[in-house]
Design a protein with these regions (language model features):
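Domain-level recognition of nuclease-like catalytic cores that cleave nucleotide substrates
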Residues: 66-96
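Short connector loops at helix/strand junctions that flank enzyme active sites
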Residues: 13-17, 27-29, 44, 52, ...
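Residue-level signal for pocket-adjacent positions within structured domains
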Residues: 37-40, 44, 84, 88
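Active-site donor-binding loop signature of nucleotide-sugar glycosyltransferases
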Residues: 3, 34-36, 91
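Residue-level recognition of specific faces of alpha-helices
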Residues: 20, 45-48, 75-78
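Conserved catalytic cores of phosphodiester-cleaving nucleases, focusing on short active-site segments
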Residues: 18-22, 26-41, 49, 57
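Active-site metal-binding core of divalent-cation-utilizing nuclease and nuclease-like domains
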Residues: 1-31, 96
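Short, charged, amphipathic alpha-helix that recurs within catalytic cores of restriction-modification
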Residues: 45-68, 72
């Protein structure tokens, strides 16, 4: 995958809601939410991506896609960072 944009709090933001925008080898645009938790006491990192957060990410992605002449297929992934390790959840949610 190739990195297209990152929200690193230094300079111009890609989006207020989207942490990473990447393009996979098949051309799919991947919007990535990164979540970190020090413990699973409240359901873990993946559980922290609520329905409200998902809607905000989808809204921001649609706004980003409007800037493109020919928007490609896209998907929404979540990367979780926990004491037990890092997990990449591809297609974690969809835009519906």
């Amino acid at each position: 995958m190739n990195l297209i944009g990152i929200d690193n709090n230094s300079g111009e933001k890609v989006s207020e809601e989207i942490d990473l925008i990447m393009r996979s080898s098949d051309g799919t645009l991947v919007f990535v939410e990164v979540r970190r938790r020090s413990s699973a006491s409240h359901g873990g990192a993946a559980a922290s991506v609520s329905a409200v957060k998902q809607r905000r990410i989808v809204f921001a992605a649609r706004h980003y896609l409007m800037r493109l002449r020919e928007p490609p297929a896209c998907r929404f992934d979540v990367v979780t960072v926990e004491p037990s390790g890092i997990e990449w959840l591809q297609g974690a949610f969809d835009a519906t």
